Design a protein with these regions (language model features):
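CheY-like receiver
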Residues: 1-71
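A cross-family signal for key residues in well-ordered alpha-helices
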Residues: 8, 32, 131, 180-181
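Short, well-ordered coil loops that connect the C-terminus of an alpha-helix to the N-terminus
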Residues: 12-13, 136, 185
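Conserved binding/recognition cores within well-folded domains
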Residues: 53-170
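Short, basic/aromatic-enriched C-terminal tail that caps enzymatic domains
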Residues: 172-185
Length: 185
């Protein structure tokens, strides 16, 4: 059978289709199947590049819309702890609440966000960006490379904060007094 037969049997499919054929007469049928593109053989490299660019744009728009919807939901959110951060890794987009984050660590111009359930996300934002965003929600800078969710701290032990998940994070000498005040108050 043809590609059209296969698509007809599937009914719906979770992927995009680019038809490549030597026959112009199938173009209308390809349009009916909502093909991303219809390329005549021999396929020209620039035509294939354009089709792939169109695919990327279409999927970036979906991600962008999802992120924009979450942004608008955050603006209307009265409970700051219910606000969600949008984190994109590869082709997946995650939405996590600040309460889920145990701590953030700096890695050059990237930040690793660690969650209570053991997940780890790498973000292209700096730790300073996250500090600005999360400090009003109870996050505390304990070291130049570490930001901690105060609600996750169980105790201080020999220059370290210990979290509910047993993680031990160093507190810099410069930050010790500030950390003690923040935890006491």
């Amino acid at each position: 059978g043809s590609g059209f037969d296969m698509l007809h049997k599937l009914g719906s499919w979770p992927f995009e289709v680019i038809f490549t054929t030597g026959f112009q007469r199938y173009a209308i049928q390809a349009i009916r199947f909502s093909a991303l593109d219809y390329l005549l053989k021999p396929v020209q490299p620039d035509e294939l590049t354009e089709a792939l660019d169109r695919f990327r744009e279409r999927h970036m728009d979906v991600d962008r819309r999802t992120v924009q919807q979450q942004f608008l939901a955050n603006i209307g959110q009265r409970d700051e702890q219910a606000m969600k951060l949008t984190l994109t890794t590869g082709d997946r987009t995650y939405f996590i609440t600040p309460a889920e984050i145990t701590h953030c660590t700096a890695d050059d111009n990237y930040t690793e966000l660690h969650t209570a359930d053991g997940r780890r996300f790498v973000s292209a934002r700096t730790l300073k960006d996250y500090e600005d965003m999360l400090a009003p929600l109870g996050f505390l800078r304990v070291h130049r490379s570490t930001l901690v969710n105060k609600s996750q701290i169980t105790h201080l032990d020999d220059g370290h904060v210990v979290l509910k998940n047993q993680a031990r994070l160093e507190v810099s000498r410069r930050k010790r007094e500030e950390v003690l005040k923040a935890l006491a108050g």
